[in-house]
Protein backbone atom coordinates (compact mmCIF):
# COMPACT_ATOMS: atom_id res chain seq x y z
CA UNK A 1 0.00 0.00 0.00
CA UNK A 2 1.42 3.38 -0.98
CA UNK A 3 2.06 6.09 1.63
CA UNK A 4 -0.53 8.31 -0.10
CA UNK A 5 -3.22 5.67 0.23
CA UNK A 6 -2.27 5.03 3.85
CA UNK A 7 -2.64 8.74 4.60
CA UNK A 8 -6.07 8.91 2.99
CA UNK A 9 -7.27 5.84 4.85
CA UNK A 10 -5.94 6.93 8.23
CA UNK A 11 -7.29 10.47 8.54
CA UNK A 12 -10.88 11.10 9.64
CA UNK A 13 -12.11 7.50 9.72
CA UNK A 14 -13.10 5.12 12.46
CA UNK A 15 -14.07 1.51 11.76
CA UNK A 16 -14.51 2.35 8.10
CA UNK A 17 -17.00 5.21 8.70
CA UNK A 18 -16.09 8.65 7.40
CA UNK A 19 -16.53 11.75 9.57
CA UNK A 20 -18.18 14.07 7.11
CA UNK A 21 -17.27 17.25 8.97
CA UNK A 22 -13.57 16.77 8.26
CA UNK A 23 -14.21 17.24 4.55
CA UNK A 24 -17.59 18.89 4.08
CA UNK A 25 -17.89 21.35 6.99
CA UNK A 26 -16.00 24.48 5.90
CA UNK A 27 -16.99 27.46 8.08
CA UNK A 28 -14.36 29.67 6.42
CA UNK A 29 -15.84 29.22 2.94
CA UNK A 30 -17.23 32.34 1.23
CA UNK A 31 -20.00 31.33 -1.21
CA UNK A 32 -19.45 32.36 -4.82
CA UNK A 33 -22.02 34.31 -6.82
CA UNK A 34 -22.50 31.28 -9.06
CA UNK A 35 -23.04 28.73 -6.25
CA UNK A 36 -26.49 27.30 -5.63
CA UNK A 37 -27.17 27.91 -1.93
CA UNK A 38 -29.52 25.84 0.22
CA UNK A 39 -30.88 26.38 3.73
CA UNK A 40 -31.77 23.07 5.42
CA UNK A 41 -33.60 22.68 8.73
CA UNK A 42 -31.65 19.80 10.28
CA UNK A 43 -32.75 17.66 13.24
CA UNK A 44 -29.80 15.38 14.10
CA UNK A 45 -30.14 12.03 15.81
CA UNK A 46 -29.17 12.10 19.53
CA UNK A 47 -25.41 12.25 19.88
CA UNK A 48 -24.76 13.59 16.37
CA UNK A 49 -23.18 17.08 16.49
CA UNK A 50 -24.86 19.71 14.28
CA UNK A 51 -21.61 20.22 12.35
CA UNK A 52 -21.52 16.53 11.47
CA UNK A 53 -25.20 16.57 10.51
CA UNK A 54 -24.79 19.63 8.28
CA UNK A 55 -21.68 18.18 6.68
CA UNK A 56 -23.50 14.89 6.08
CA UNK A 57 -26.23 16.75 4.21
CA UNK A 58 -23.64 18.54 2.06
CA UNK A 59 -21.82 15.28 1.35
CA UNK A 60 -24.78 13.04 0.60
CA UNK A 61 -26.39 15.65 -1.67
CA UNK A 62 -23.19 16.15 -3.67
CA UNK A 63 -20.05 13.97 -3.99
CA UNK A 64 -19.89 12.07 -0.71
CA UNK A 65 -20.38 8.46 0.25
CA UNK A 66 -19.92 6.61 3.55
CA UNK A 67 -16.30 5.55 3.01
CA UNK A 68 -13.29 6.41 0.91
CA UNK A 69 -13.18 5.05 -2.62
CA UNK A 70 -10.14 4.82 -4.86
CA UNK A 71 -11.85 6.81 -7.64
CA UNK A 72 -11.78 9.90 -5.38
CA UNK A 73 -8.22 10.28 -6.62
CA UNK A 74 -9.39 10.60 -10.23
CA UNK A 75 -11.21 13.91 -9.76
CA UNK A 76 -11.03 17.13 -7.75
CA UNK A 77 -13.39 16.75 -4.80
CA UNK A 78 -12.46 20.23 -3.67
CA UNK A 79 -13.95 21.59 -6.88
CA UNK A 80 -17.14 19.53 -6.94
CA UNK A 81 -18.11 18.89 -3.33
CA UNK A 82 -20.97 20.61 -1.53
CA UNK A 83 -19.90 22.62 1.51
CA UNK A 84 -21.76 23.26 4.75
CA UNK A 85 -20.45 26.75 5.46
CA UNK A 86 -22.67 27.95 8.31
CA UNK A 87 -24.90 26.46 11.03
CA UNK A 88 -27.26 28.29 13.36
CA UNK A 89 -29.83 27.06 15.90
CA UNK A 90 -33.53 27.47 15.16
CA UNK A 91 -34.97 29.89 17.76
CA UNK A 92 -37.47 28.25 20.07
CA UNK A 93 -36.78 24.72 18.83
CA UNK A 94 -34.77 22.07 20.63
CA UNK A 95 -32.08 20.27 18.64
CA UNK A 96 -32.99 21.92 15.33
CA UNK A 97 -30.48 23.84 13.23
CA UNK A 98 -30.35 25.71 9.94
CA UNK A 99 -27.46 24.34 7.90
CA UNK A 100 -26.36 26.44 4.93
CA UNK A 101 -24.87 24.47 2.05
CA UNK A 102 -23.16 25.76 -1.10
CA UNK A 103 -23.12 23.66 -4.27
CA UNK A 104 -20.80 24.29 -7.23
CA UNK A 105 -22.79 25.02 -10.37
CA UNK A 106 -21.04 22.28 -12.33
CA UNK A 107 -22.92 19.65 -10.30
CA UNK A 108 -26.16 20.39 -12.18
CA UNK A 109 -27.42 19.92 -15.72
CA UNK A 110 -28.45 23.15 -17.39
CA UNK A 111 -32.20 23.78 -17.59
CA UNK A 112 -33.18 20.73 -15.52
CA UNK A 113 -35.17 21.10 -12.31
CA UNK A 114 -35.33 17.31 -12.28
CA UNK A 115 -31.56 16.99 -12.02
CA UNK A 116 -31.25 19.78 -9.46
CA UNK A 117 -33.82 18.18 -7.17
CA UNK A 118 -32.41 14.69 -7.63
CA UNK A 119 -29.18 15.90 -6.06
CA UNK A 120 -30.31 18.41 -3.46
CA UNK A 121 -33.42 16.59 -2.16
CA UNK A 122 -32.60 13.04 -3.18
CA UNK A 123 -31.32 10.20 -0.99
CA UNK A 124 -30.12 12.57 1.72
CA UNK A 125 -33.67 12.79 3.13
CA UNK A 126 -33.49 9.14 4.19
CA UNK A 127 -30.12 9.50 5.91
CA UNK A 128 -29.99 7.67 9.27
CA UNK A 129 -27.90 10.32 11.04
CA UNK A 130 -30.86 12.71 10.77
CA UNK A 131 -34.17 12.48 12.57
CA UNK A 132 -35.69 14.98 10.14
CA UNK A 133 -34.61 17.27 7.32
CA UNK A 134 -36.39 20.11 5.57
CA UNK A 135 -35.22 22.25 2.66
CA UNK A 136 -36.31 25.75 3.66
CA UNK A 137 -34.96 27.80 0.75
CA UNK A 138 -32.71 27.82 -2.31
CA UNK A 139 -30.71 30.63 -3.90
CA UNK A 140 -30.66 30.10 -7.66
CA UNK A 141 -27.79 32.12 -9.18
CA UNK A 142 -28.36 34.09 -12.40
CA UNK A 143 -25.89 31.87 -14.25
CA UNK A 144 -28.18 28.88 -13.66
CA UNK A 145 -31.46 30.78 -13.99
CA UNK A 146 -30.49 31.84 -17.51
CA UNK A 147 -30.41 28.20 -18.62
CA UNK A 148 -34.21 27.96 -18.12
CA UNK A 149 -37.03 29.26 -20.30
CA UNK A 150 -39.25 29.80 -17.26
CA UNK A 151 -42.95 30.72 -17.57
CA UNK A 152 -44.31 30.40 -21.12
CA UNK A 153 -45.48 34.02 -21.20
CA UNK A 154 -45.56 35.82 -17.85
CA UNK A 155 -47.82 38.38 -16.23
CA UNK A 156 -47.73 41.25 -18.73
CA UNK A 157 -48.15 39.06 -21.80
CA UNK A 158 -51.12 37.33 -20.17
CA UNK A 159 -52.81 40.65 -19.46
CA UNK A 160 -52.23 41.72 -23.05
CA UNK A 161 -53.68 38.46 -24.37
CA UNK A 162 -56.76 38.84 -22.17
CA UNK A 163 -57.02 42.64 -22.49
CA UNK A 164 -57.67 42.92 -18.75
CA UNK A 165 -55.85 45.40 -16.54
CA UNK A 166 -56.04 47.09 -13.15
CA UNK A 167 -57.69 44.35 -11.12
CA UNK A 168 -57.25 40.75 -10.00
CA UNK A 169 -58.66 38.11 -12.32
CA UNK A 170 -61.59 35.96 -11.18
CA UNK A 171 -61.85 32.20 -11.51
CA UNK A 172 -63.94 29.23 -10.43
CA UNK A 173 -63.28 25.51 -10.13
CA UNK A 174 -66.18 23.49 -11.50
CA UNK A 175 -67.85 21.26 -8.89
CA UNK A 176 -68.58 18.48 -8.28
CA UNK A 177 -65.05 17.79 -9.33
CA UNK A 178 -65.88 14.27 -10.54
CA UNK A 179 -69.01 12.69 -11.97
CA UNK A 180 -70.46 15.29 -14.36
CA UNK A 181 -70.97 14.43 -18.01
CA UNK A 182 -69.07 16.56 -20.52
CA UNK A 183 -72.22 18.39 -21.64
CA UNK A 184 -73.33 19.26 -18.12
CA UNK A 185 -69.77 20.25 -17.28
CA UNK A 186 -69.71 22.63 -20.25
CA UNK A 187 -73.03 24.09 -19.17
CA UNK A 188 -71.61 24.87 -15.72
CA UNK A 189 -68.60 26.54 -17.37
CA UNK A 190 -70.85 28.69 -19.56
CA UNK A 191 -73.00 29.88 -16.66
CA UNK A 192 -69.96 30.97 -14.66
CA UNK A 193 -68.27 32.78 -17.53
CA UNK A 194 -71.37 34.64 -18.69
CA UNK A 195 -71.90 35.80 -15.12
CA UNK A 196 -68.63 37.74 -15.11
CA UNK A 197 -65.74 35.41 -14.30
CA UNK A 198 -62.56 35.51 -16.35
CA UNK A 199 -61.69 31.84 -15.97
CA UNK A 200 -63.18 28.53 -15.01
CA UNK A 201 -61.07 25.52 -14.14
CA UNK A 202 -60.85 21.76 -14.34
CA UNK A 203 -60.21 20.31 -10.92
CA UNK A 204 -56.79 18.75 -10.53
CA UNK A 205 -58.07 15.17 -10.69
CA UNK A 206 -60.16 15.68 -13.82
CA UNK A 207 -58.15 13.98 -16.56
CA UNK A 208 -59.95 11.48 -18.82
CA UNK A 209 -62.21 9.24 -16.76
CA UNK A 210 -65.02 6.96 -18.00
CA UNK A 211 -67.75 9.46 -17.09
CA UNK A 212 -66.08 12.29 -19.07
CA UNK A 213 -63.35 11.69 -21.63
CA UNK A 214 -60.93 14.52 -22.19
CA UNK A 215 -61.81 15.22 -25.82
CA UNK A 216 -65.52 15.58 -25.04
CA UNK A 217 -64.74 17.91 -22.14
CA UNK A 218 -62.45 20.06 -24.27
CA UNK A 219 -65.13 20.43 -26.97
CA UNK A 220 -67.98 21.38 -24.64
CA UNK A 221 -65.80 23.78 -22.63
CA UNK A 222 -64.56 25.48 -25.80
CA UNK A 223 -68.16 25.93 -26.94
CA UNK A 224 -69.04 27.41 -23.54
CA UNK A 225 -66.23 29.94 -23.47
CA UNK A 226 -66.75 31.09 -27.08
CA UNK A 227 -70.48 31.57 -26.46
CA UNK A 228 -69.82 33.53 -23.26
CA UNK A 229 -67.26 35.69 -25.06
CA UNK A 230 -69.86 36.67 -27.65
CA UNK A 231 -72.41 37.53 -24.96
CA UNK A 232 -70.11 39.51 -22.66
CA UNK A 233 -67.59 41.05 -25.04
CA UNK A 234 -64.77 39.83 -22.77
CA UNK A 235 -62.05 37.27 -23.45
CA UNK A 236 -62.69 34.14 -21.40
CA UNK A 237 -60.68 31.05 -20.55
CA UNK A 238 -61.09 27.59 -19.07
CA UNK A 239 -58.11 25.73 -17.63
CA UNK A 240 -58.25 22.54 -19.68
CA UNK A 241 -56.28 19.98 -17.69
CA UNK A 242 -53.82 18.34 -20.09
CA UNK A 243 -52.24 16.16 -17.37
CA UNK A 244 -52.03 12.55 -18.57
CA UNK A 245 -50.32 9.25 -17.93
CA UNK A 246 -47.55 9.92 -20.46
CA UNK A 247 -45.81 13.04 -21.77
CA UNK A 248 -46.86 12.12 -25.31
CA UNK A 249 -50.54 11.98 -24.33
CA UNK A 250 -50.21 15.26 -22.42
CA UNK A 251 -48.79 17.06 -25.45
CA UNK A 252 -51.50 15.53 -27.67
CA UNK A 253 -54.15 17.09 -25.44
CA UNK A 254 -52.39 20.45 -25.48
CA UNK A 255 -52.23 20.30 -29.29
CA UNK A 256 -55.99 19.67 -29.45
CA UNK A 257 -56.62 22.62 -27.11
CA UNK A 258 -54.55 24.87 -29.36
CA UNK A 259 -56.47 23.66 -32.42
CA UNK A 260 -59.74 24.58 -30.69
CA UNK A 261 -58.42 28.12 -30.19
CA UNK A 262 -58.67 28.23 -26.40
CA UNK A 263 -56.21 30.51 -24.54
CA UNK A 264 -55.02 28.30 -21.66
CA UNK A 265 -54.29 24.74 -20.55
CA UNK A 266 -53.42 23.27 -17.17
CA UNK A 267 -50.97 20.83 -15.61
CA UNK A 268 -50.58 19.16 -12.19
CA UNK A 269 -46.86 19.80 -11.93
CA UNK A 270 -45.95 17.73 -8.87
CA UNK A 271 -47.89 14.59 -9.74
CA UNK A 272 -47.03 15.03 -13.42
CA UNK A 273 -43.36 15.67 -12.73
CA UNK A 274 -40.92 18.46 -13.55
CA UNK A 275 -39.73 16.91 -16.80
CA UNK A 276 -43.29 16.73 -18.14
CA UNK A 277 -44.02 20.23 -16.87
CA UNK A 278 -41.00 21.78 -18.55
CA UNK A 279 -41.87 20.02 -21.81
CA UNK A 280 -45.42 21.38 -21.67
CA UNK A 281 -44.19 24.89 -20.80
CA UNK A 282 -41.94 24.88 -23.87
CA UNK A 283 -44.86 23.76 -26.05
CA UNK A 284 -47.10 26.49 -24.61
CA UNK A 285 -44.60 29.26 -25.34
CA UNK A 286 -44.04 28.02 -28.88
CA UNK A 287 -47.78 27.83 -29.55
CA UNK A 288 -49.24 30.81 -27.71
CA UNK A 289 -50.98 28.94 -24.89
CA UNK A 290 -51.04 30.15 -21.30
CA UNK A 291 -50.23 27.49 -18.70
CA UNK A 292 -52.05 27.16 -15.39
CA UNK A 293 -50.29 25.07 -12.74
CA UNK A 294 -51.96 23.15 -9.93
CA UNK A 295 -49.88 22.04 -6.96
CA UNK A 296 -51.74 18.83 -6.07
CA UNK A 297 -49.66 16.73 -3.65
CA UNK A 298 -47.73 19.72 -2.30
CA UNK A 299 -48.89 19.24 1.30
CA UNK A 300 -47.39 15.74 1.34
CA UNK A 301 -44.06 17.46 0.77
CA UNK A 302 -44.32 20.82 2.52
CA UNK A 303 -46.80 20.69 5.40
CA UNK A 304 -44.59 19.39 8.23
CA UNK A 305 -42.36 22.15 9.50
CA UNK A 306 -39.36 19.95 10.33
CA UNK A 307 -39.30 17.54 7.36
CA UNK A 308 -39.82 17.87 3.63
CA UNK A 309 -39.51 20.86 1.31
CA UNK A 310 -41.00 24.28 1.97
CA UNK A 311 -43.41 25.49 -0.69
CA UNK A 312 -41.24 28.54 -1.41
CA UNK A 313 -38.71 26.10 -2.88
CA UNK A 314 -41.40 24.37 -4.94
CA UNK A 315 -42.55 27.80 -6.12
CA UNK A 316 -39.03 28.74 -7.23
CA UNK A 317 -38.71 25.40 -9.01
CA UNK A 318 -41.98 26.03 -10.82
CA UNK A 319 -40.84 29.46 -11.97
CA UNK A 320 -37.78 27.80 -13.48
CA UNK A 321 -39.70 24.86 -14.97
CA UNK A 322 -42.49 27.02 -16.37
CA UNK A 323 -46.04 28.09 -15.56
CA UNK A 324 -48.08 31.29 -15.88
CA UNK A 325 -50.28 30.66 -12.81
CA UNK A 326 -49.78 28.56 -9.70
CA UNK A 327 -51.96 27.97 -6.65
CA UNK A 328 -50.38 29.67 -3.66
CA UNK A 329 -52.83 29.40 -0.76
CA UNK A 330 -55.20 32.10 0.43
CA UNK A 331 -54.23 33.08 4.01
CA UNK A 332 -57.98 33.43 4.71
CA UNK A 333 -59.60 30.25 3.32
CA UNK A 334 -59.78 26.54 4.16
CA UNK A 335 -56.24 25.58 3.10
CA UNK A 336 -52.94 26.06 4.87
CA UNK A 337 -51.23 29.45 4.48
CA UNK A 338 -49.71 31.80 7.08
CA UNK A 339 -49.74 35.41 5.89
CA UNK A 340 -46.09 36.52 6.06
CA UNK A 341 -44.80 33.21 4.72
CA UNK A 342 -47.37 33.18 1.91
CA UNK A 343 -46.55 36.74 0.86
CA UNK A 344 -42.88 35.81 0.88
CA UNK A 345 -43.24 33.16 -1.79
CA UNK A 346 -45.84 35.22 -3.68
CA UNK A 347 -43.13 37.86 -4.12
CA UNK A 348 -40.70 35.14 -5.21
CA UNK A 349 -43.19 34.17 -7.90
CA UNK A 350 -43.92 37.66 -9.23
CA UNK A 351 -40.99 40.00 -8.61
CA UNK A 352 -37.74 40.40 -10.55
CA UNK A 353 -35.61 40.77 -7.43
CA UNK A 354 -36.42 39.70 -3.86
CA UNK A 355 -34.29 40.71 -0.87
CA UNK A 356 -33.44 38.36 1.96
CA UNK A 357 -36.09 38.73 4.67
CA UNK A 358 -36.11 36.16 7.44
CA UNK A 359 -39.34 37.59 8.87
CA UNK A 360 -41.05 36.21 5.75
CA UNK A 361 -39.00 33.02 5.56
CA UNK A 362 -36.76 34.25 2.73
CA UNK A 363 -33.24 33.05 3.55
CA UNK A 364 -31.45 34.38 0.46
CA UNK A 365 -31.60 37.37 -1.83
CA UNK A 366 -33.00 36.04 -5.10
CA UNK A 367 -32.36 37.76 -8.46
CA UNK A 368 -34.53 36.43 -11.28
CA UNK A 369 -32.79 38.40 -14.06
CA UNK A 370 -35.12 38.36 -17.10
CA UNK A 371 -37.29 35.37 -16.11
CA UNK A 372 -41.02 36.26 -16.43
CA UNK A 373 -43.20 36.28 -13.33
CA UNK A 374 -45.92 33.83 -12.30
CA UNK A 375 -49.41 34.90 -11.21
CA UNK A 376 -50.37 33.48 -7.78
CA UNK A 377 -53.80 31.87 -7.56
CA UNK A 378 -55.74 32.15 -4.30
CA UNK A 379 -58.26 29.33 -3.96
CA UNK A 380 -59.78 27.09 -1.33
CA UNK A 381 -62.74 27.94 0.89
CA UNK A 382 -63.08 31.61 -0.09
CA UNK A 383 -66.27 33.61 -0.66
CA UNK A 384 -67.46 37.21 -1.11
CA UNK A 385 -66.73 38.26 2.48
CA UNK A 386 -63.07 37.42 1.84
CA UNK A 387 -62.86 39.69 -1.21
CA UNK A 388 -61.52 42.82 0.56
CA UNK A 389 -58.77 40.86 2.33
CA UNK A 390 -57.82 38.98 -0.84
CA UNK A 391 -57.68 42.18 -2.88
CA UNK A 392 -55.45 43.82 -0.27
CA UNK A 393 -53.18 40.80 0.29
CA UNK A 394 -52.63 39.66 -3.31
CA UNK A 395 -53.00 42.89 -5.28
CA UNK A 396 -53.85 43.15 -8.97
CA UNK A 397 -51.50 40.50 -10.36
CA UNK A 398 -53.38 37.53 -8.99
CA UNK A 399 -56.26 35.16 -9.72
CA UNK A 400 -58.93 34.89 -7.03
CA UNK A 401 -60.62 31.55 -7.53
CA UNK A 402 -63.99 30.84 -5.95
CA UNK A 403 -65.27 27.28 -6.44
CA UNK A 404 -67.94 26.68 -3.84
CA UNK A 405 -68.03 30.46 -3.41
CA UNK A 406 -69.51 30.70 -6.92
CA UNK A 407 -71.34 27.41 -7.48
CA UNK A 408 -72.83 27.41 -3.98
CA UNK A 409 -74.88 30.55 -4.62
CA UNK A 410 -78.55 29.81 -3.90
CA UNK A 411 -79.63 31.17 -7.29
CA UNK A 412 -77.12 29.26 -9.42
CA UNK A 413 -73.76 29.60 -11.10
CA UNK A 414 -74.29 32.80 -13.08
CA UNK A 415 -75.64 34.77 -10.08
CA UNK A 416 -72.73 33.41 -8.04
CA UNK A 417 -70.33 34.75 -10.64
CA UNK A 418 -72.15 38.10 -10.68
CA UNK A 419 -71.82 38.34 -6.89
CA UNK A 420 -68.08 37.77 -7.02
CA UNK A 421 -67.55 40.22 -9.89
CA UNK A 422 -69.57 42.94 -8.14
CA UNK A 423 -67.69 42.39 -4.87
CA UNK A 424 -64.34 42.56 -6.67
CA UNK A 425 -65.19 45.71 -8.63
CA UNK A 426 -66.41 47.37 -5.41
CA UNK A 427 -63.17 46.50 -3.59
CA UNK A 428 -60.96 47.69 -6.45
CA UNK A 429 -62.87 50.97 -6.69
CA UNK A 430 -62.65 51.50 -2.93
CA UNK A 431 -58.92 50.77 -2.96
CA UNK A 432 -58.37 53.19 -5.84
CA UNK A 433 -60.22 55.85 -3.85
CA UNK A 434 -57.74 55.37 -1.01
CA UNK A 435 -60.00 53.50 1.39
CA UNK A 436 -58.58 50.94 3.84
CA UNK A 437 -59.81 47.52 2.73
CA UNK A 438 -58.61 45.82 5.91
CA UNK A 439 -60.64 48.17 8.10
CA UNK A 440 -63.61 49.01 5.89
CA UNK A 441 -63.93 45.80 3.89
CA UNK A 442 -67.18 44.52 5.36
CA UNK A 443 -68.81 47.93 4.97
CA UNK A 444 -67.70 48.10 1.33
CA UNK A 445 -69.30 44.71 0.63
CA UNK A 446 -72.54 45.65 2.43
CA UNK A 447 -72.92 48.88 0.46
CA UNK A 448 -72.28 47.09 -2.84
CA UNK A 449 -74.89 44.47 -1.90
CA UNK A 450 -77.57 47.18 -1.69
CA UNK A 451 -77.61 47.49 -5.49
CA UNK A 452 -76.74 43.87 -6.33
CA UNK A 453 -79.32 41.30 -5.22
CA UNK A 454 -76.94 38.52 -6.28
CA UNK A 455 -74.26 39.82 -3.92
CA UNK A 456 -76.80 40.33 -1.14
CA UNK A 457 -77.88 36.69 -1.40
CA UNK A 458 -74.27 35.52 -1.35
CA UNK A 459 -73.51 37.65 1.71
CA UNK A 460 -76.42 36.09 3.55
CA UNK A 461 -75.43 32.50 2.68
CA UNK A 462 -71.78 32.80 3.74
CA UNK A 463 -71.95 35.29 6.59
CA UNK A 464 -71.12 32.66 9.24
CA UNK A 465 -68.58 30.57 7.31
CA UNK A 466 -65.09 30.56 8.81
CA UNK A 467 -62.10 28.20 8.73
CA UNK A 468 -60.29 28.94 11.97
CA UNK A 469 -57.56 26.41 12.68
CA UNK A 470 -54.03 26.97 13.88
CA UNK A 471 -51.49 27.07 11.05
CA UNK A 472 -49.02 24.18 10.86
CA UNK A 473 -46.22 26.25 9.37
CA UNK A 474 -45.19 29.26 11.43
CA UNK A 475 -42.00 31.24 11.45
From Swiss-Prot:
<keyword id="KW-0007">Acetylation</keyword>
<dbReference type="GO" id="GO:0009507">
    <property type="term" value="C:chloroplast"/>
</dbReference>
<comment type="similarity">
    <text>Belongs to the RuBisCO large chain family. Type I subfamily.</text>
</comment>
<feature type="binding site">
    <location>
        <position position="295"/>
    </location>
    <ligand>
        <name>substrate</name>
    </ligand>
</feature>
<dbReference type="InterPro" id="IPR033966">
    <property type="entry name" value="RuBisCO"/>
</dbReference>
<keyword id="KW-0503">Monooxygenase</keyword>
<keyword id="KW-0560">Oxidoreductase</keyword>
<dbReference type="Pfam" id="PF02788">
    <property type="entry name" value="RuBisCO_large_N"/>
</dbReference>
<comment type="subunit">
    <text>Heterohexadecamer of 8 large chains and 8 small chains; disulfide-linked. The disulfide link is formed within the large subunit homodimers.</text>
</comment>
<keyword id="KW-0456">Lyase</keyword>
<keyword id="KW-0113">Calvin cycle</keyword>
<dbReference type="InterPro" id="IPR017443">
    <property type="entry name" value="RuBisCO_lsu_fd_N"/>
</dbReference>
<feature type="binding site" description="in homodimeric partner">
    <location>
        <position position="123"/>
    </location>
    <ligand>
        <name>substrate</name>
    </ligand>
</feature>
<dbReference type="InterPro" id="IPR020878">
    <property type="entry name" value="RuBisCo_large_chain_AS"/>
</dbReference>
<dbReference type="InterPro" id="IPR020888">
    <property type="entry name" value="RuBisCO_lsuI"/>
</dbReference>
<comment type="function">
    <text>RuBisCO catalyzes two reactions: the carboxylation of D-ribulose 1,5-bisphosphate, the primary event in carbon dioxide fixation, as well as the oxidative fragmentation of the pentose substrate in the photorespiration process. Both reactions occur simultaneously and in competition at the same active site.</text>
</comment>
<feature type="modified residue" description="N-acetylproline">
    <location>
        <position position="3"/>
    </location>
</feature>
<dbReference type="GO" id="GO:0000287">
    <property type="term" value="F:magnesium ion binding"/>
</dbReference>
<dbReference type="GO" id="GO:0009853">
    <property type="term" value="P:photorespiration"/>
</dbReference>
<dbReference type="InterPro" id="IPR036376">
    <property type="entry name" value="RuBisCO_lsu_C_sf"/>
</dbReference>
<feature type="binding site">
    <location>
        <position position="177"/>
    </location>
    <ligand>
        <name>substrate</name>
    </ligand>
</feature>
<dbReference type="Pfam" id="PF00016">
    <property type="entry name" value="RuBisCO_large"/>
</dbReference>
<dbReference type="GO" id="GO:0004497">
    <property type="term" value="F:monooxygenase activity"/>
</dbReference>
<feature type="binding site">
    <location>
        <position position="379"/>
    </location>
    <ligand>
        <name>substrate</name>
    </ligand>
</feature>
<keyword id="KW-1015">Disulfide bond</keyword>
<feature type="binding site">
    <location>
        <position position="173"/>
    </location>
    <ligand>
        <name>substrate</name>
    </ligand>
</feature>
<keyword id="KW-0602">Photosynthesis</keyword>
<keyword id="KW-0601">Photorespiration</keyword>
<dbReference type="InterPro" id="IPR000685">
    <property type="entry name" value="RuBisCO_lsu_C"/>
</dbReference>
<keyword id="KW-0150">Chloroplast</keyword>
<dbReference type="GO" id="GO:0016984">
    <property type="term" value="F:ribulose-bisphosphate carboxylase activity"/>
</dbReference>
<feature type="site" description="Transition state stabilizer">
    <location>
        <position position="334"/>
    </location>
</feature>
<keyword id="KW-0120">Carbon dioxide fixation</keyword>
<feature type="binding site">
    <location>
        <position position="204"/>
    </location>
    <ligand>
        <name>Mg(2+)</name>
    </ligand>
</feature>
<dbReference type="InterPro" id="IPR036422">
    <property type="entry name" value="RuBisCO_lsu_N_sf"/>
</dbReference>
<protein>
    <recommendedName>
        <fullName>Ribulose bisphosphate carboxylase large chain</fullName>
        <ecNumber>4.1.1.39</ecNumber>
    </recommendedName>
</protein>
<feature type="active site" description="Proton acceptor">
    <location>
        <position position="294"/>
    </location>
</feature>
<keyword id="KW-0934">Plastid</keyword>
<keyword id="KW-0460">Magnesium</keyword>
<keyword id="KW-0488">Methylation</keyword>
<feature type="modified residue" description="N6,N6,N6-trimethyllysine">
    <location>
        <position position="14"/>
    </location>
</feature>
<keyword id="KW-0479">Metal-binding</keyword>
